[in-house]
Each structure stands twice: as C-alpha cells, then as structure tokens.
C-alpha cells in the first residue's frame, strides 16, 4: 500500500486471497490515520486482525502487540533535554523499547466467533469489553 487511496484495493486483494488473518505493522502513519476505516473494513471481512498499536484495538480491532509509545515519547523527550543541555549526541546510548503490551478486544472476538484461550487472556496487558 502506497497511500490512503490504496486501502480498499489492498483489502480486496486480501479477501480474494482468502486470508485467515491480517497483521498490520505499526510503521505506517497513513494507516494510523485510517484506523477507523481500516478496522471497520477488516471486521466486515470477518478477518481476525493483529495490529502493532493499541489504538486500532480501541477502534474495534481484535488484538495488538507492541511497544508502549507513551514510554518511547518520554524517552525521546529525555534525549532532547540532554541534547539541549549540551550532551554530545555521540555519548547517548542507543535504546530499544523495554515495555510491550498485548491488548485484546473481547467484543470483536465474540463478533468474530472466536474464543481467546485463557493463557492468552492471562498474558494480556488490557482487554477492551
């Protein structure tokens, strides 16, 4: 998908391929802006979906697993503070996310006729009802 105009065609290809599920990576800002439309279309196709950002689950997507972006933004703010106070950028370590969350939308699971196994529910950071 190159942009928002390609969303419908991309989902039509997924439907024609008779996909069993859909995984949407968190690296495309255009998809984040289209999340309401994307989730509605995916659910209309009755495709279980896994997203990289919680906001998709809050809009009705089935599940998300990914970093907590609020933590990432806080860390970026700390870097900016250090840089504006004169820290040499070469002295700052490269950091990776350390907190990840699994969020499950139980309403969507029920609508899709899916039962989420108890061990998966126990590992969830949050559920949407």
Model-predicted regions and their roles:
Residues 1-129:
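Short hydrophobic alpha-helices and adjacent helix-cap/hinge residues
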